């Protein structure tokens, strides 16, 4: 939320002032222009606080949108903002906000980005508000009650009554949804990275436990084929989430700083990053959250009763599971994200008909599937070539489905659409990774995700070559298997 707020405010900072000639009188400003200049000054101060790493300087930001009538549907927002310039000279803002926020994320933050309805405007507007006034008093904010949550308890969530809260308008009246989407995109990317990192942490605990836990006959748990197969499936989903999450990070970097992002193994054409990000953000957030819950739950089970206990913090999978549940809830549940994704895929064109901007997805897939083809020889090269063909066939089928299906039909079957898209994009990224250096674990991941379609925990499809040794390579790495650090 803090990163998202910083990015949003950075888009409204004043440009550097042009130098004035000594012979030219300084320009005069209207009251509205003076107010806009004051807003930019306030935003610049807040932005500096948000990006600071100094503990006594830095700020955190909350995000207050959810209200009782609407939940995820912010169009039902009842909070109002009235233009009422203060006679004082402080920087508290010329707007007065009144309303009730049912969920306030980061209640202990120093500032907040919120939505409110202004008189005479059909849309919502976005506002910046400090939580405290310069006098030290709270800025019209009353905490009604703290929420009792399943997890993420160190991050307070509360119901708030806003009465006379002073605020600054961000952008134009009625364009709050467009403004707040900047924050939503970044928080959804953060959500995806949190999912991938939580999976990796849980899996690391499960792997470490499997290498020291001895069962009947003194056999180490990691050498039991069934347990090893389970770890391999968890590893596959963790890799899938990591690739998706950091593809979104890369696209976000390109969208914000196209000239400062170093080249990578992934082909993204200049100007297409923002469009790709628009489609992939809801997809990535939804899929990584689901896979995260599956892997962490399985990690708890992999430790048996020990996993269900409240352990020391580094090993506390019980808390990790509680905290991870929010990843599929906040910033859009799975169905909300699917609706958002389908809306992007079937968006009407301003000139009539449908906007086929989703063709950028096909261009990305085609170019990255073709990049580096033929660099690996032998069995691995043949496997990757089969995978490339399989991915492209599914994408062609998806394109036809998107082209011919109505918005209602695609939304109703949205979960299937979501996972088929995930199959294509994860498969493409796994293929790019495997071609990069021919790592056996990466090639094995392609075999399982693309050719065996193991996109969820549990056996899927027919048994293929790779078997137990493939499990070991995927989980513990080829080096460990070859040098005897892992023995079946």
What is each of the regions a protein language model found here?
Residues 92-138:
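A short core secondary-structure module
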Residues 239-285, 301, 399-411:
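C-terminal helix-coil-helix/basic helical segment that borders enzyme active sites and/or dimer interfaces
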Residues 364-488:
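C-terminal amphipathic alpha-helical interaction region
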Residues 240-247, 292-295, 333-334, 340, ...:
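Extended, well-ordered alpha-helical segments in internal regulatory regions
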Residues 1-48, 105-106, 330, 438:
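Internal helix-loop-helix
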Residues 271-364, 458-487:
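Alpha-helix capping/hinge segments and adjacent helical runs
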Residues 135, 144, 156-187, 204-223, ...:
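A glycine-rich, basic-preceded beta-loop-alpha segment at the flavin cofactor/substrate interface
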Residues 62-111, 274-290, 294-310, 318-326, ...:
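Flexible, glycine/threonine-enriched loop-and-boundary segments that flank and lead into catalytic domains
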């Amino acid at each position: 939320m803090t990163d998202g707020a910083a990015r949003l405010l950075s888009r409204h900072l004043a440009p550097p002032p042009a130098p004035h000639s000594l012979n030219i009188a300084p320009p005069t400003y209207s009251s509205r222009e003076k107010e806009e200049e004051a807003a930019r000054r306030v935003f610049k101060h807040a932005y500096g606080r948000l990006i600071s790493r100094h503990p006594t300087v830095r700020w955190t930001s909350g995000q207050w949108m959810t209200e009782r009538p609407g939940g995820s549907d912010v169009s039902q927002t009842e909070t109002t903002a009235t233009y009422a310039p203060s006679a004082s000279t402080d920087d508290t803002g010329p707007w007065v906000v009144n309303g009730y926020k049912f969920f306030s994320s980061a209640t202990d933050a120093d500032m907040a980005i919120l939505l409110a309805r202004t008189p005479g405007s059909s849309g919502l507007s976005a506002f910046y508000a400090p939580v405290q006034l310069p006098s030290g008093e709270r800025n019209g904010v009353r905490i009604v009650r703290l929420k009792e949550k399943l997890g993420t308890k160190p991050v307070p969530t509360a119901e708030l009554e806003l009465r006379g809260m002073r605020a600054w308008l961000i952008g134009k009246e009625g364009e709050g949804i467009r403004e707040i989407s900047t924050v939503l995109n970044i928080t959804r990317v953060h959500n995806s990275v949190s999912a991938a990192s939580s999976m990796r942490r849980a899996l690391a605990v499960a792997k470490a436990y499997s290498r020291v836990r001895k069962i009947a006959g003194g056999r180490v748990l990691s050498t039991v084929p069934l347990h090893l197969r389970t770890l391999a499936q968890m590893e596959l989903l963790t890799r899938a989430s990591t690739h998706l999450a950091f593809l979104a990070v890369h696209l976000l970097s390109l969208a914000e700083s196209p000239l400062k992002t170093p080249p990578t193994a992934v082909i993204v054409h200049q100007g297409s990053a923002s469009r790709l990000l628009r489609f992939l953000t809801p997809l990535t957030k939804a899929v990584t959250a689901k896979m995260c819950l599956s892997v962490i739950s399985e990690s708890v089970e992999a430790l048996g009763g020990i996993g269900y206990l409240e352990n020391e913090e580094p090993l506390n999978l019980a808390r990790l599971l509680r905290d991870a549940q929010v990843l599929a809830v906040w910033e859009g549940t799975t169905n909300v994200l699917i609706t958002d994704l389908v809306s992007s895929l079937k968006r009407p064109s301003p000139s009539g008909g449908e906007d086929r901007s989703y063709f950028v997805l096909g261009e990305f897939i085609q170019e990255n599937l073709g990049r580096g083809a033929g660099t690996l020889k032998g069995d691995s090269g043949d496997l990757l070539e089969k995978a490339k063909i399989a991915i492209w066939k599914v994408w062609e089928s998806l394109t036809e489905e998107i082209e011919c299906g109505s918005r209602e039909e695609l939304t109703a079957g949205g979960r299937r659409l979501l996972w088929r898209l995930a199959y294509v994009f994860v498969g493409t990224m796994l293929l790019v990774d495997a071609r990069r250096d021919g790592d056996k674990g990466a090639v094995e991941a392609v075999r399982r995700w693309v050719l065996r379609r193991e996109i969820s925990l549990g056996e899927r499809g027919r048994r293929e070559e790779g078997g137990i040794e493939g499990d070991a390579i995927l989980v513990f790495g080829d080096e460990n298997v070859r040098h005897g650090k892992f023995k079946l």
